[in-house]
Amino acid sequence: MSEQRQESLQNNPNLSKKDVKIVEKILSKNDIKAAEMKERYLKEGLYVLNFMSSPGSGKTTMLENLADFKDFKFCVVEGDLQTNRDADRLRKKGVSAHQITTGEACHLEASMIEGAFDLLKDEGALEKSDFLIIENVGNLVCPSSYNLGAAMNIVLLSVPEGDDKVLKYPTMFMCADAVIISKADMVEVFNFRVSQVKEDMQKLKPEAPIFLMSSKDPKSLEDFKNFLLEKKRENYQSTHSF
């Protein structure tokens, strides 16, 4: 757990000392498992991406479209509170996907990923993939606290959500190794200020690239796909401390 996270917990007026110790124990246990999973990812030769966003930002649609690229081979761990709908959508595109239903939990944890990882391995999906993509539970708060051992943490912000979210949810955007502004074809409809997002990201994480993406603009997806392939070639590993 990062010093910043620990200090934030200890200074939270809504948490008793007992509560703080419980939360610290949970997060520390998750960090240990995340480190173990990272070793397993590397052993399998997988480059792991953790996609986070609000519900309905377009994560699954983006993955469906990525499946059309012959040079981008991946399998997926899906996280949702209920239903297998997203995993089913991806399977129809020929993508090996395992659904994790969390019930009431608003995030995925490293121990949850382990079970899905083992199932994908048993199915032979890992050896056919260059990337393992984790589509986290739709939420701009909880997932940013849980390390999954990913090489990159990528945050989507959809245009209909508004351009003010970066500083409203700083913990999420501080962990981003890249930001996608999705549904970018609706920028004018919603008076969405891309410049505001860029300005706010300069304050939080200036090194994180920002991509404008729309399902109506195939080149925007191809540019992002090429970016991911390059990061894999570089073996870029996120330095963010959860």
UniProtKB/Swiss-Prot annotation:
Metal coordination and the nucleotide-bound state of HypB directly influence each other. Binding of nickel in the G-domain decreases GTPase activity and modulates the oligomeric state of the protein. Binding of zinc inhibits the GTPase activity. GTP and GDP modulate coordination, stoichiometry, and affinity of nickel, but not zinc. Potassium increases the GTPase activity but has no effect on the other biochemical properties of the protein. Ni(2+) binds at residues 106-107, 142. Changing residue 21 to A: Does not affect interaction with HypA. GO terms for biological process: protein maturation. InterPro entries: CobW/HypB/UreG_nucleotide-bd, Hyd_mat_HypB, P-loop_NTPase. Disruption phenotype: Mutant has negligible hydrogenase activity and is severely impaired in urease activity. Keywords: GTP-binding, Hydrolase, Metal-binding, Nickel, Nucleotide-binding, Zinc. Zn(2+) binds at residues 106, 142. The keyword Glycosyltransferase does not apply. The keyword Nucleotide-binding applies. GO terms for molecular function: GTP binding; GTPase activity; nickel cation binding; zinc ion binding. Residues 48-211 are annotated as: G-domain. Gene3D superfamilies: P-loop containing nucleotide triphosphate hydrolases. Changing residue 190 to V: Strong decrease in GTP-dependent dimerization, but does not affect nickel-dependent dimerization. PANTHER family: HYDROGENASE MATURATION FACTOR HYPB, HYDROGENASE PROTEIN ASSEMBLY PROTEIN, NICKEL CHAPERONE. Belongs to the SIMIBI class G3E GTPase family. HypB/HupM subfamily. Contains a metal-binding site, which can bind nickel or zinc, with a higher affinity for zinc. His-107 is an essential nickel ligand only in the nucleotide-free state of the protein. NCBIfam families: hypB. Monomer and homodimer. Dimerization is induced by nickel, but not by zinc. Dimerization is also induced by GTP. Forms complexes with HypA. Involved in the maturation of [NiFe] hydrogenases. Required for nickel insertion into the metal center of the hydrogenase. Is also required for maturation of urease. Exhibits a low intrinsic GTPase activity, which is essential for nickel insertion. This is Hydrogenase/urease maturation factor HypB. It comes from Helicobacter pylori (strain ATCC 700392 / 26695) (Campylobacter pylori). The gene is hypB.
